[in-house]
Amino acid sequence: MLEYRKLTSIEDPLFAQMHRLMQEVFPPEEVLAFKLWEEPLRDPGIQVFVAVSDGAVVGATEYRYVPEFRVEMTDFTIIGRSGLGIGRFLLKQREKHLRELAAASGAESLGMFAEIYNPEDAAGSLSVRGVLPMHPAVRREVLSHLGFRKLDLDYVHPSWDHEGKAVRGLDFCFRPADDETASLPASLPAGFLRWYYAALPNKPAEWEEMMKKLEARESVALLPI
């Protein structure tokens, strides 16, 4: 049976297992250094949970609900083994918790943001390693089924290794609460991205250029993935 366990300290042995799992499936520029996790894990607004089977971390997810923007964000989902129903388990537990967080804030969610690898991009296709469920093409199709669509912009984000590199190979996506939503006011993703990446001191010129273009727009379309 899978257990859903919250992580709040880098001293938790389960965190060391999760961090190793991240290093196995994500490229180095997407993985925050071990010691730099100490502050995020203490942040009550950041939710980091692991799926545990017989004492071993077999999956993980990080997410948040941001009342200021009335949006959710899934930072990552990791499925470490096939055949255990880990993806479904993490999804159901996360959705339940996010509904509780939104209700507690008194602000109904407009939807969820997520960065999704683009398997047609050579860099993105080679970026994620590990078990088959973590293959970019598999993940993207599953997320499409869940209702995610990509924002119409040439997306780039700052690297999480604090070196200020521009990371490509992903699309910035949104799953609207109202499935009929065809576009977003540009101020929503622009404001959210400024807030989300404020924690990283070094940002590449490519990211700043993307943000300026986004902030100059009135709206941004949601396209199929």
Q: What does each model-identified segment do?
A:
Residues 2-3, 7-10, 103-225:
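Terminal substrate-recognition subdomain of acyl/acetyltransferases
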Residues 39-50, 165-166:
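A short helix-loop-beta-strand connector motif used in the catalytic cores of GNAT acetyltransferases and
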Residues 50, 56-64, 72-78:
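Conserved beta-strand in the GNAT
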Residues 52-54, 175-176:
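Active-site beta-strand termini and strand-to-loop segments that position acidic
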Residues 65-74, 82, 107-110:
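A conserved beta-turn-beta hairpin within the catalytic core of GNAT-like acetyltransferases
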Residues 76-85, 118:
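A short, internal acetyl-CoA/4′-phosphopantetheine-binding micro-motif in the GNAT/acyltransferase core
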Residues 83-100, 109:
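Conserved acetyl-CoA-binding loop-helix of GNAT-fold acetyltransferases
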